[in-house]
Amino acid sequence: MAKTLYEKLFDAHVVYEAAGETPILYINRHLIHEVTSPQAFDGLRVAGRQVRQIGKTFGTMDHSISTQVRDVNKLEGQAKIQVLELAKNCEASGISLFDMQTKEQGIVHVMGPEQGLTLPGMTIVCGDSHTATHGAFGALAFGIGTSEVEHVLATQTLKQARAKSMKVEVRGKVNPGITAKDIVLAIIGKTTMAGGTGHVVEFYGEAIRDLSMEGRMTVCNMAIEFGAKAGLVAPDETTFAYLKDRPHAPKGKDWDDAVEYWKTLKSDDDAVFDSVVVLEAKDIAPQVTWGTNPGQVIGIDQVVPNPQEMADPVTKASAEKALAYIGLDANTDMKNIPVDQVFIGSCTNSRIEDLRAAAAVMKGRKKADNVKRVLVVPGSGLVKEQAEKEGLDKIFIEAGAEWRNPGCSMCLGMNDDRLGEWERCASTSNRNFEGRQGRNGRTHLVSPAMAAAAAMFGKFVDIRHVELN
């Protein structure tokens, strides 16, 4: 019987499935951070349980840490408590932790692939909704809640119902200036933020295959933003080249054997998907969100939609509410919207490829006077090291940006990088919900190049018309 890649991955990890019961899956890799793990470890202690397989769980510090200081003793309040608890729990359990004193530390979904902890064919979980990022490697990766974090620590398994399968095909090649972020925002714009609910999505098409691993991670990272459980890209030579010689990747004959197996990880030609979505790559323009969810997105060459022209009453009401919050009028040209802050970072767009794209725009230019602050936050210590080796940090600083240490930063209002009330931000992150970047902050999601251009010109501009250096 023909199977999709998702079905192959799921079936290969079923430990036990009783009639009428939810299957139990084996979990190959468990990634943890300081926010969703403390209660899980407390639960283990109360129950008198140990971590079952310490070699399959790895920790990092990312969400609540400061991107300005590397000393845990200089953290304040809840952030300090969370970081200290993670360090204590990992040490007591024997779990490997990439803390703030190591260059391997970084955002969990950047650190995992960099270290070769993310491999094709794996099941990967983390107490974080953007765990779908790791699906770019042909791994079944999804976010879990804190009680499930405890269960995986204790058993290395998880009850998991089968999802439906969705195929998203992006046909042909994108035009110059169009990035992975534009591709996935265009997908979400077409499907809406609920279009993938109940599905695991596999991304297909020439435009997807042309992407680097960094680009594929961006696409899979935002699968959750149109409701999908997980996102997948079948592994290929691009995948293998990225993983070869990573610290935790197989070596020698084990590598050769692994690659032979990984090559089988693809949907069968006659596999049937429950849902299919098709986009033409040539039609995708640089994307900018105009509302308060990632599905409220248009091309930079378009105007803000008019809710009065929307037939569906729910969509209309949502658009009216979004525009009231975001402070825009219908039919506003997206290129006439000024920004107060710019954030380049997050698990969506903080890898070296993203920083190079931003630097190409910012080189030889200066931050616009109306832009109060530009934060450039690398996704890991290794990304930071590579960027500095290439001189990208100097480009950012000379342009008027702040070059920070690794962390989740302004993606979410959980640390000391936040928007002021009603400030408008061009952000490379993944969510533009109300208050996501700070109380009453207004977020517009864009690619790294588009964010950099907004910083230099003080408003959204079409990156296709910006000379790169």
UniProtKB/Swiss-Prot annotation:
Similarity-based family: Belongs to the aconitase/IPM isomerase family. LeuC type 1 subfamily.
Domain of life: Bacteria
Residues noted as binding [4Fe-4S] cluster in the record, renumbered to the chain: 347, 408, 411
Organism lineage string: Bacteria, Pseudomonadati, Pseudomonadota, Gammaproteobacteria, Pasteurellales
SUPFAM superfamilies assigned: Aconitase iron-sulfur domain (SSF53732)
Textual note on the cofactor: Binds 1 [4Fe-4S] cluster per subunit.
The reaction(s) this protein catalyses: (2R,3S)-3-isopropylmalate = (2S)-2-isopropylmalate
Protein name as it appears in the record: 3-isopropylmalate dehydratase large subunit
PROSITE patterns: ACONITASE_1, ACONITASE_2
Annotated signal peptide: none
Keywords: 4Fe-4S, Amino-acid biosynthesis, Branched-chain amino acid biosynthesis, Iron, Iron-sulfur, Leucine biosynthesis, Lyase, Metal-binding
EC number: 4.2.1.33
Main EC class the enzyme belongs to: lyase
Biological function: Catalyzes the isomerization between 2-isopropylmalate and 3-isopropylmalate, via the formation of 2-isopropylmaleate.
Cofactor: [4Fe-4S] cluster
Pathway: Amino-acid biosynthesis; L-leucine biosynthesis; L-leucine from 3-methyl-2-oxobutanoate: step 2/4
Subunit structure: Heterodimer of LeuC and LeuD.
Xref: InterPro entries: 3-IsopropMal_deHydase_lsu (IPR004430), Acnase/IPM_dHydase_lsu_aba_1/3 (IPR015931), Acoase/IPM_deHydtase_lsu_aba (IPR001030), Aconitase_4Fe-4S_BS (IPR018136), Aconitase_4Fe-4S_dom (IPR036008), IPM_dehydratase_rel_enz (IPR050067), IPMI_cat (IPR033941)
